Amino acid sequence: MKFLNRMMLIATMTLLTSLSLHAEVKNSNTTFAKDALTPFVQSGQLPGAICVFYKDGIQENTCVGYADVAAKRPITMNDVYMQCSQTKGFCGVTIAMLVEEGRISLDDPVSKYLPEFKTLWVKASEKDGVRTLVKAKNTLTIRMVMNHTGGFPFEISAKQGNIKGGGWSGGAPLRQTAAIAASSPLLFEPGTRVQYSNTGIDIGAAIVEVVTGQRWEIFLKERVLLPLGMTASSFRPTDEQLKTQVEMYDCVKDAPAKYRRQNNMQQRPYNDDHVFASAGAGLWTTANDQLKFYKMLMNLGMGENGVRILKEETVKNLLAKSSRPKGMGGYSLGLTAPEEDNENAWFGHGGAWGTFCMVNWHKKQLTLWAVQLCGQPRPWDAAREKAQKQFFQYVIDNSDVKAYTGRTK
């Protein structure tokens, strides 16, 4: 019966998506990003990139260069790529859903759902290979694991890049990741410092599994991806999808970028049995799909297709502003966010291979950047940022254009 109900929900969401009136997005007919980025593509330093600027229903889409330089395959908005840590925001949305529904509180102890976290130990010191541990005094909460103040390392031992089948998309499923983390010493007392951690976000996803009785990736698909029409996003892209993969490259100073077959933190084959859903970094997507998610955040929980994912107040209070104590930097639930929300505040996230998307819900602005690059330097960043400023100023100067507000009554 539960399975049948889920299938009916998916069917209903699909029907709503197909019947809803899509918001009109006008082409800006500008080339700010293309003009800024083309010289770097011509030099070979930038293999290929996707850049999107959006404000009030006016959008500039730019695809320059190649998804595969050797094959001379142009990069497109429908090519799949690994967004790495941008996956964290998707976990944040699923946590926010459960808070909105009254099923969890951000200040609930993690041990309420995962008993293995009842007693935790903190590494006090280490000398001559001997570690001294002390029992944790503070209660580890859901809020802490989602905003990187829980005290966990970046990745657990099973997900290190030097392990075959490891990396953030391999190593272990979510519940096993949580169990390993619970049995390992914390780096500091929970809630007292910041340590960027995929592990903490994976623990958050494991809590979603306990509360919902579903694998996290299934809950995400049914409650977020399918309702928004994000049909190209998954943790295991198909062989057919991978034919459109944006290939990975290493940045080289003053020289063309160098092809990289894989990074050890993202090991081939990308859809093999060693691949597990990682909430910290693991969701493949396309630029068109990613826009649907971030426009939903920009529109305070409402997808461009008219499907509501979260209430406005949920996005404002849980995602668009920091959930950390003051002075620890801005971060909410899997998303970079301002300590204090204001009309100039942006929230969103970036990923290890250079992707990012940020939104300003007050001004209905969005900027998306998609590349698959490792290392430095990245001399095009300044040029892209200048192009972004030019675009937003252009839209302000042409504000008489009928704009989509992002709201559906």
Where do the model's predicted regions map?
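Bacterial N-terminal signal peptides
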Residues: L9-S18
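Short, gly/Ser/Thr-rich active-site loops of penicillin-recognizing serine hydrolases
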Residues: N299, E313-T314, L319-G327, E340, ...
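Short, conserved catalytic-motif segment at the N-terminal edge
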Residues: K26-Q83, R103, T119-E126
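Bacterial N-terminal signal peptides that target proteins for export
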Residues: M1-L9
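Active-site SXXK
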Residues: L37, D56-G57, M82-V110, G204-E209, ...
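Short, well-ordered beta-strand elements
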Residues: C357-M358, K364-P377
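Short, surface-exposed loop or secondary-structure junction motifs
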Residues: W121-A345
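Boundary at the C-terminal end of the N-terminal hydrophobic targeting segment
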Residues: L21-V25
